[in-house]
Amino acid sequence: MPPTTALSALLLLLLSPASHSHNGNETSTSAIKSSTVQSHQSATTSTEVTTGHPVASTLASTQPSNPTPFTTSTQSPSMPTSTPNPTSNQSGGNLTSSVSEVDKTKTSSPSSTAFTSSSGQTASSGGKSGDSFTTAPTTTLGLINVSSQPTDLNTTSKLLSTPTTDNTTSPQQPVDSSPSTASHPVGQHTPAAVPSSSGSTPSTDNSTLTWKPTTHKPLGTSEATQPLTSQTPGITTLPVSTLQQSMASTVGTTTEEFTHLISNGTPVAPPGPSTPSPIWAFGNYQLNCEPPIRPDEELLILNLTRASLCERSPLDEKEKLVELLCHSVKASFKPAEDLCTLHVAPILDNQAVAVKRIIIETKLSPKAVYELLKDRWDDLTEAGVSDMKLGKEGPPEVNEDRFSLPLIITIVCMASFLLLVAALYGCCHQRISQRKDQQRLTEELQTVENGYHDNPTLEVMETPSEMQEKKVVNLNGELGDSWIVPLDNLTKDDLDEEEDTHL
């Protein structure tokens, strides 16, 4: 680096006023305005840095350092912050910078950031400027040491997500400042990220800042970084090498534990394509052979005298056995409508098979389903079905005549009662007419005997002997069981008593 450039930068640092930081009784959440760095160049720009939490730090370049880039990045939702330390053998000069916390009352989003080149002029990267950052040309930054605490450096960066970068930034390259992940107490000093400029580059009013890609190196090839420890309670930051060792040990322990669990437990079969089960289909019957299993008491096991079903046995024997099992499960099995699938598994070291499942699928036509559901329309209505159609046919008509059944029952009962009354009346009328006829004949006979017969032509016929009644007297003078006797048994005296009344 030319000495003139170093001297000019040193003069700028000596002439720049120290930053003002608010200490004392203020809390860690108060916003601190950043100091302004003024330069003796053509244009002087003072901006406010509104990124990060309230942190005040003092950097002193009193020790020479090697040309090894020192990289520190903070965990932020945006890009990491890189702070390169260029080579410098000059001493003296203090640079004080302060980073203020993002104002909570701001409503504008940081869409773009305005950066200042090495000469002090500010160039906009485009868009609305929500945040601004001022860079001062410094050439005497050495190894970072905190004046108040020379042994420990306070930082809240998380090295788990810290990428090690090889900075190749030019004087016009912007540096992204990301918000810190924890707030520091007021009074403690934390190193701030300040870019350095190499060489004196003339700047113009409308200089365009160009981004240069940074090359990311793997975590294993990290450069010599200074161990950083945090004094914040509950947060400890380890160096990159220690983090790598801890991660490696953690991964190793996890792998050993996983291997130990697998070795002590049941052997796990490596995942791979499963072997498809052979399926034989003949007509409406299917035979599905699954992998061999051990005999189980809950399974139906069939010992076979011939070759097993899952082996290359004749299809006729398989079909016969499958058909027999399917018809046994469903007596009304119809090959035209039903499909039977038999799932079996051969038994290890035995000529037997285990019947695992018998599935019968019934293929019904829509017409058959409609006829079955038609009879249960009331149940469908209760289940939430409002309509059912098959072509032009709809749900069955509902009979809303609630009095039809009681009316029919009443009519039948009344008809039965009328028939019963008519039968009783017929029987009574027949008996009455018979009594009247007998009484009339008796009166006529008595009139004829007394001679007062009106009809002279009336002839009284002799009754046959079988119709005459006469008491039979036994030898002992007692009446017998029957008093009807034939006419021949009458005595002559009885016959003389009869007179011929015929004129």
Curated annotation (Swiss-Prot):
Domains as described in the record: Both the O-glycan-rich domain of the extracellular domain and the C-terminus PDZ-binding motif (DTHL) in the cytoplasmic tail harbor an apical sorting signal. The cytoplasmic domain is necessary for the apical membrane targeting and renal tubulogenesis. The large highly anionic extracellular domain allows to maintain open filtration pathways between neighboring podocyte foot processes. The cytoplasmic C-terminus PDZ-binding motif (DTHL) is essential for interaction with NHERF1 and for targeting NHERF1 to the apical cell membrane. The extracellular domain is necessary for microvillus formation.
Name under which the protein is recorded: Podocalyxin
Signal peptide: 1-21
Residues exposed to the Cytoplasmic side: 426-503
Segments crossing the lipid bilayer: 405-425
Places the protein is found: Apical cell membrane; Cell projection, Microvillus; Membrane raft; Cell projection, Lamellipodium
GO cellular component, one term: microvillus membrane
Function: Involved in the regulation of both adhesion and cell morphology and cancer progression. Functions as an anti-adhesive molecule that maintains an open filtration pathway between neighboring foot processes in the podocyte by charge repulsion. Acts as a pro-adhesive molecule, enhancing the adherence of cells to immobilized ligands, increasing the rate of migration and cell-cell contacts in an integrin-dependent manner. Induces the formation of apical actin-dependent microvilli.
PANTHER family attached to this UniProt entry: PODOCALYXIN
Family: Belongs to the podocalyxin family.
This protein's UniProt keywords: Cell adhesion, Cell membrane, Cell projection, Glycoprotein, Membrane, Phosphoprotein, Signal, Transmembrane, Transmembrane helix
